[in-house]
Structure formats: structure tokens, C-alpha cells
Amino acid sequence: MNKINNFLKKNIITIFTIYLFMQPVLDIATSVALYKFNVDFTISSLIRVIFLIFILYYLIFVERKKINIKMLILIMLYSIIFMLCNVLFKDNPNITYEIKSLLNNIYLPISLLFTFQIFNNREFNRKKLYSVLLIYMLFVFVPNIFHIGFDSYAYSKEGSVGFFYSANAIGSLISVITPLLISELVIKRKKLYLILFLLMYGYILLTLGTKAPILCALIVFIYYILYAVINLIKNKSYKKLVILCTTFILFVLASIKLITMTPFYDNLVIHLNFLKIKKISDLFTMHNIDHFVFGSRLSFFKDTFNIYLSSNIMQKIFGLGYFLNGKIMKLVEMDYLDIFLHQGIIGFVIILFTYFKTIFYIFKSYFKKFKSNFFNIKKSSMVISIIISILCAFLTGHVLATPAVSIFISVSLVIYYNEFKMEE
């Protein structure tokens, strides 16, 4: 056993890197199973469960850090109570579905503990992360170019998600990692690679058909415009500033024209027609804002919150679960709210404690030296990446409770944390 443990400890980064490279393949396999065979629990799900068990083994029996073991015991105790509540307080519980949903949620805190542990005093090559991102993007870009990808929506709206299943999940994953890769290309002045990447990135965003990734891309774009403008003003390079502003205006005009020919624009028109919006002022009602901006998520939250309020004290503390009165409960698709409602107050704290603690530390470190850090492209890109992940989790969901995405959230956060920690 000691030989096995020593081998794992020595090669854990390699093992984890292989697992990361498996993610696009697992997601494609899931998509095929769901689209073609309508099978919910797939071999991909099984592999992720096996890797979760491997993580538990590694943390408990290989590294043996008390703080990790205490946190894992807390997660396990909560999980047992959560399942007991589902059995005791529901007339017709679906245990299998509840376990599956629970595993999706505890994947984030456990993978965070794991990545913190293995990245401590070990080097992780970020190029591997960028390579995985490019694999994901290629499996969206190529199928969309040849019109052989799966539809982003089952009906009504347009868009293609390549060979993947969820437009929100794949859009969030790409949006979160992209700022760091862009910063790498900008810092190393790899202009040709940057242009090619941005063209592919832009095409993917516009053909996915979803709104949130566009918003995320705008945040990155605005940062670089501000960065350039402030630097040019500081250096009194007014001619370059005029050229930049002119280029920016032309780019915006060209983008507006280009967007009108994309599924993203078509979906906006479909949505506005559905809501019977005749003029811009018609949008500014609570009903239309909910439907157009939040995709009816506020209405879903209201319905689920009423169920939560009428539940017993144990369900308020440990969660409603995901199956009620013989059917699957409709998710709000705003991750923070879904975790709170379905996992309860205690579940919310346990699942998101390490996540929030890590983000708080990074933000605190960044804004403590905001003036200097703002002009540090790498650090600003890290903070932008976190802001994007928060927005995606809040606006579209399928980020924190989707293992295919949350594993990359864990990796990114730990990389960012270690980067800021090095300066202390």
C-alpha cells in the first residue's frame, strides 16, 4: 500500500492532468448518450464518480492532512443528514436522483480541497489548461462551421453547441478560462495566435446563441480598452489615442452589422417578438426583465422559494432536495440560489465555504493594491475570470453544480490564489 501511495503522491499532477484532458471526451460522450439514446446516467458520469472516490482516497490516505479530513467528514455528515431528510420527509423520494444531484454539488468543495493540496509546492503547467480550453473550442468551432453540431435549444431559439450538450455550461467554461489565455498571448506578444484565437472565440460566442458569454466577452474587451486608453493618456500619446478611438468606433459599427447575421441576434428578435416588445421602454417592466434578461429565472425562484418557506425546519436547514411529489423539481438555474434552496442553509455554507473564502482572499489582495494591479494584465485577467464565473453562476447556472465546469473553476481559483499568495 505504501508503494501505491508513494506512486500517487509522486505522479498526482500527471494523473490529474490526464483527467483534465479527458473532460472534453467525457462531455462529448455525455452529449451523444443524451441526444441519441436519451440516457441520463452515462459512462462519463461513472468516471467522474470514480475520480471523486479517488480524490477522497488521496486526501484521506495519501496526504492525510487533518484540516482536509475534517472538512471531508463535515461534507459526509451533511450528505448523510441530507439524504435522511429526503427519506423521512418525502412521501415518494427518488433516492437515485437525490444522490446524483448531491454528488454534483459536493464535487466543487471536494475538488477545491484536492487542487489546493496537489498544487501546494508542485508546479502545474498552465499551458495544459489552455490546451484543454482549445480542445473544447475546436469541438464547438468545427461542428458549427460544418453545421453538424447539436442545437443549443430544443425548440424556438437558434444556435449550435458543437458536439456538447449544454450551451450554458460550455459557454461558461470557455468564458472563465479565456481571459487568462488572452493575457498570456498579449504579454508574450503573440499577435498572430491572438488574432486567430479571437476570431474563433468570437465565432463560437455568436453561434452558441446565448447572451451570457457575450456579456462576459464585453467585460474582457472593456478592460483592455480602458488599459490602453489610460496608458496612452499617461504617456501623452494622443495620436495613438485618436487612432485607437477611431478603430474602436469602426469595430463597434462592424460588430453591430455582423451580429445581425448571427443566431445570437435571431434569438434576441425571437425573444422580443415573443414578449411583444414594440419599443425599448416596453422592456422595463418586472415581467419583461425577468423573461428577457433572466430567462424567467426570477419566476422560478419565486415558486421554489414559496415551497422552501412552507417546508419544515429540517428542510430549511438541510435542503429541499431535488425530487418532490413524484417529479423532479424545476431548478432556478442560478447556482447560488439553487444551492441555498435545494441544499439548505447548512449545505450552502459547507459547499461554498472554501469557494467564497478563496475568492475573498483574491479580491482582497487585488484591490489592496488596485492601482498597480490594474495595470498588471495577468492579475487583472484572473480577477476578470472570477467575476465572469460569478456572473455565469448567477445568470445562467450550470457552473458550480456541474462537475464538467466546476473542476475547471477549482483549478482556476487555486492557480489565482497561489499567484497572489506568492507576493506575501
What is the meaning of each model-derived region?
Residues 1-61, 80-89, 143:
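N-terminal signal-anchor transmembrane segment
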Residues 228-286, 308-311:
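A membrane-periplasm/extracellular boundary helix in multi-pass inner-membrane enzymes
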Residues 45-50, 71-83, 93-118, 132, ...:
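Aromatic-anchored transmembrane helix interface
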Residues 29-37, 87-95, 138-170, 264-274:
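Membrane-interfacial helix-loop-helix modules of multi-pass inner-membrane proteins that assemble, modify
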Residues 382-424:
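Transmembrane alpha-helices of multi-pass inner-membrane enzymes
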Residues 150-155, 161, 288-346:
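Long extracytoplasmic/lumenal interhelical loops at the membrane interface
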Residues 64, 73, 191, 230, ...:
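Hydrophobic transmembrane alpha-helices and their immediate junctions
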Residues 127-153, 165-230:
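Alpha-helical transmembrane segments of multi-pass inner-membrane proteins
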